Amino acid sequence: MVLGSRVLTYNGEIYNYAGLRAQLPGPWRSTSDTEVLLHLLAREGTAGLSKVVGMFAFAIWEGDARRLILARDRLGIKPLYYRILPDGLAFASELKALLVLDKPEIDASAVRDYLFHGYVPAPKSIYRGICKLPAGHTLAWQDGRVRIERYWEPSADIKTRSEEETLYELDALLREVIPAHTLADVPVGVFLSGGIDSALTASYLHAPHTYSLGFDAKERSELAGARAAAKHLGTVHTEMTAQAADFEQALDAIPRIFDEPFADSAAWSNYLIAQFARREVTVALSGEGGDEVFCGYPRYWSSVGTRSNVLNRALARGLPPLSRLGASMQRHAYTGLPAFAAALGGMPPVQIDQLLARDWRESGYDYLWFYRQFWREGEDALVQLRWLDLHTSLAEGLLTKVDRTSMAHSLEVRPPLLDHRLVEFMLSVDPALLVDRRRRRGKLLERRLMQPRLPPGHLERPKSGFGLPVHRWLKSQPRVLHRAVARLRERGVLARSVGPEFRRAWSLLVLDRWFAAFG
């Protein structure tokens, strides 16, 4: 869209665009949120982003100043890649679009990062010279110079409130935030697993259409829990049961969707539920982000940050002894950072170094570089871990998974629990109101809100989601892994074969499929 000398291209949704439009003078040529964003940027520059509620990635060319500005939403819901060229800058929502210029070399350090994290963290991409704009950042290009700045950083200051006051404010905020995410000219659905986050999302809407996915493996199927929640909430509910053949059919499609190696096995279930829901709706809400916002991960109430357990946990995950960690890691060995990294479950560094061929490994490589820039020394362990999750695995892992798998089916998925107003509010809540470390339980506030809204006993169900029984499938298909590892050795990526341990096996299978698609 054009306004004077400014040209805007934009991907996303601005939920409060009507309110912003009322504050801007116009003149108006349409009723779109794109035009509202363009007028806001023309009037206030990137400072105006503080007023925006939504998910977005955009580029605006300011012709008079001959300046290009890129921006990505606060939490990284929408992606944005860029590539600095000798005579300009190229950008796209998909990495593959930048490969048409020419195909750069694969970044060996990005492969190491992938095996450690399960994804390639921003600002890196799998290719040298192609970058991801980090969440909550802007990039300005002018006369060949690039400046990248963070425009949003939530406060971690705790505010004193009683539990009842906190619940009242939280409920009021959810009543505003969740319905706002249904803004659309088309029907909006809700993904409903057997868990509490998706049920919370559905409970603040009137008779929404809900969609659930189960598997032929009974031990991992969430259909019964989702069905009970849907009945209690009065939703219009639809279910799908996926078979192994559905998973295998999706297996070759996934690497092309992500453009980079991405090892979260839940991507396949997200892909299938999006494909299923798209038959009826083009927009869906999900409960993504509930674990980060309401404190649902076991690490939040564990003792991962204490001195007594750090080394035991790190060594149990295969991290090398302190004498082999390198000076930079030794400085953090008793702060909990290595233990936290190990708890996330990626491939341990010592195993990565043993596995990769010589050209792909680097002596003394700092596998914690991505986490280190967000680690807050001296904070309560819960505050540290939430802050780290918010800035790392949320955008690079969880939200990447949801965006790519849904957009592959032209389905727009919106995560209302990651509305920045809700995130900021929950970061201000006393940790004592969020987790019970003695009883090893999280999501205390969310449980209080949902107790009267769900069937008896539903909140005692084990943590769930649209999980896929990948481990069982891999064990039933040993030749698949064997052939994948053999191909990676032929490419000179691996130095040796591996055993059937799940995380390692799955990461390597995905890496092989990515090389087949792009390498």
Spell out what each predicted region is.
Residues 1-259, 270, 274, 451-452, ...:
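Cysteine-centered catalytic environments shared across enzyme families
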Residues 74, 85, 272-333, 376, ...:
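Active-site adenylate/phosphate-handling loop in enzymes that bind or generate adenylated species
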Residues 13-14, 63-65, 75, 96, ...:
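Short, glycine-/Ser/Thr-/acidic-enriched flexible segments
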Residues 77, 98-101, 118, 133-136, ...:
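Phosphate/oxyanion-binding loops and surfaces in catalytic or ligand/nucleic-acid-binding neighborhoods
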Residues 47, 100-103, 129-134, 145, ...:
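Adenosyl-5′-phosphate
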Residues 261-265:
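Donor nucleotide-sugar recognition loop
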